[in-house]
Design a protein with these regions (language model features):
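Enzyme catalytic cores with a strong preference for nitrogen-chemistry domains
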Residues: 1-202
Length: 202
C-alpha cells in the first residue's frame, strides 16, 4: 500500500480507429515516466478513439481493441505504474463503454459506464449497453472509484462509489470540444466533491 498515490493524467489525442498507434503512444508515455508515478490515467475510449460511432459494431475492430489491451498488459510486466484506460468491451451480444485497470502484466479488472448520454452529438444508447452501479477498484492499496464521463453528472453513481468504500474518484472523460462547457464541468465536479467529501481527479 502507498501512503501517497502519484497519478499522471495522459491527456493524449487518440485517433479514431488507430488502435495500434493509440496503444503505442500510451506505452511510450508510460516508459518515459519510469517510476515517477503509481497510476497513469488515459481518457474514455482511448484505445479505440472517440467518438467511435458505428466502428464499434464491427467484430474485427473489437478483436483489434482486445489485442491492443493485451499489448498494454504486456507492457506492464515491469510492475511499474498501473494504467487506467477506456476502451469498448464486448460481452456476449452486448458492447459496453468500459474502463480497464491494467497492471503487473494483466488486465486486473474493469468497470462499465452506467449513464449513457443520448442527446446532441451523443448517441451512446444506440451502440452501447449500460453497465451496473459498481464499487471501487483497488490499486496499490487505494480504493479508487472510476466513473466514466456522464457518470459524474448523476449523483447516484458517485454516491454508490462513496458508500462502497471509495477513497478517491478518478473520472475518465472524452467529449467533443465546446468553448463554454468547462465552467459547467467544473461545477458538476465540485458538486460531487461536496456531496461525497471525496477528492476527485477529472
Amino acid at each position: 500500500m502507498v501512503t501517497n498515490l502519484k497519478i499522471a493524467l495522459a491527456q493524449l489525442n487518440p485517433l479514431v480507429g488507430d488502435v495500434i498507434g493509440n496503444v503505442d503512444k500510451l506505452i511510450s508515455v508510460r516508459s518515459k515516466l519510469e517510476n515517477s508515478v503509481d497510476v497513469l490515467v488515459a481518457p474514455e475510449l482511448y484505445i479505440s478513439g472517440y467518438p467511435i460511432d458505428d466502428l464499434v459494431l464491427r467484430e474485427d475492430f473489437l478483436d483489434l481493441v482486445d489485442k491492443g489491451l493485451e499489448n498494454l498488459a504486456k507492457a506492464t510486466k515491469d510492475c511499474k505504474s498501473s494504467i487506467i484506460v477506456g476502451a469498448p468491451r464486448k460481452e456476449k451480444n452486448t458492447i459496453r463503454n468500459s474502463v480497464f485497470v491494467i497492471e503487473n502484466g494483466d488486465i486486473s479488472t474493469f468497470r462499465d459506464k452506467f449513464e449513457l448520454p443520448n442527446s446532441g452529438v451523443f448517441d451512446e444508447q444506440r451502440i452501447f449497453t449500460p453497465g451496473n452501479l459498481s464499487g471501487p477498484v483497488n490499486i496499490k492499496g487505494v480504493r479508487i472509484g472510476i466513473p466514466i464521463c456522464e457518470d459524474i453528472w448523476k449523483e447516484n453513481v458517485i454516491e454508490c462509489l462513496a458508500e462502497s468504500g471509495a477513497e478517491i474518484i478518478v473520472s475518465i472523460n472524452a467529449s467533443p470540444f465546446t468553448l463554454s462547457k468547462n465552467n459547467e464541468r467544473l461545477s458538476v465536479a465540485i458538486s460531487r466533491i461536496r456531496e461525497n467529501e471525496l477528492p476527485l481527479v477529472y
